[in-house]
Design a protein with these regions (language model features):
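Short, compositionally biased segments
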Residues: 1-8, 226-229
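CN hydrolase (nitrilase-like) catalytic-core segments centered on the catalytic cysteine
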Residues: 1, 61, 67-171
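Active-site catalytic loop in hydrolytic enzyme cores
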Residues: 7-89, 94-110, 149, 186
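C-terminal beta-strand edge segments of enzyme domains
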Residues: 123-255
Length: 255
């Protein structure tokens, strides 16, 4: 399995999008970041809950979130409740300096501990040449350095391999899936350590739609007047509100 980020969107709107592929290249998940952060809102639209799901891959159940979605505990819990085994995280990198890398590390290690899953996190990296092309202002250039924390975290919250904090590269590691059971035996946030009768999550995972198409009226709906109905039919219609609907249809037709 593998994940990547991109910008995608049909019909004019763009969305910050994550793609999850299986080992054979099959696209298993296309999800949109549910809330663009700060200045991102000038470019990207809001995603829906349809992408808040874990999918089965050749290497295990995989879920994904982007950047500050990890600061939304309900979004993280939605994936935890679906028993994700590998969590794909992505942050921009080359931003704000070392403090951003520290924040990323805290965030992904905490999610690994809380969910009892592996976290595979990737961050971007800008070269000096790329930074110079982005801005001629030296002060702005400083804001485009550091902030890189590409890492693989175990369910126990530790680095499986040393993190990549500068430059381009790829981290490769063997994942001992038995560590998931070991962690959840002690603390399972969506199992024996959960209290659903006290605290629970309500997720609307329907794809967003800007139009709902109503079912058409039957061909003979409203063709008969109330006077043609017998007393029993009129009483039944009044009881269930159907008479009001017929009057509304007839008035609309008269116009």
């Amino acid at each position: 399995g593998g994940g990547r980020g991109c910008t995608a969107g049909p019909h004019g709107s763009l969305y910050n999008t994550q793609l999850v592929f299986d080992a054979d290249g099959t696209l298993l998940l296309r999800r949109r970041k549910i809330t663009p952060t700060f200045h991102e809102r000038m470019i990207w639209g809001q995603g829906d809950g349809a992408g808040l799901k874990a999918v089965d891959t050749a290497v295990g159940r995989v879920g994904a979130l982007a950047c500050w979605e990890h600061y939304n505990p309900l979004a993280r819990y939605a994936l935890m409740a679906q028993h994700e085994e590998i969590h794909v995280a992505q942050f921009p990198g080359s931003l704000v300096g070392p403090i951003f890398a520290e924040q990323i590390e805290v965030t992904i290690r905490h999610h690994a501990l809380e969910s009892g899953c592996f976290v595979v996190n990737s961050t971007g990296w800008l070269t000096d040449e790329q930074i110079a092309r982005i801005s001629p202002d030296e002060k702005l250039r400083k804001a485009l350095t550091g902030g890189c924390m590409t890492a693989i975290i175990s369910p126990e919250g530790s680095h499986v391999v040393p993190p990549l904090t500068s430059g381009e590269g790829i981290l490769i590691a063997d994942l001992d899936m038995g560590l998931i059971t070991k962690r959840k035996r002690m603390m399972d946030s969506v199992g024996h350590y959960a209290r659903p009768e006290l605290l629970s999550l309500n997720l609307d995972n329907r794809p967003a739609a800007t139009m709902q198409q109503a079912a058409p009226f039957p061909a003979n709906h409203g063709s008969a007047s109330d006077e043609a109905d017998g007393p029993g039919e009129r009483a039944s219609a009044a009881a269930d509100g159907a008479s009001d609907q017929r009057v509304a249809v007839l008035r609309g037709a008269a116009r």
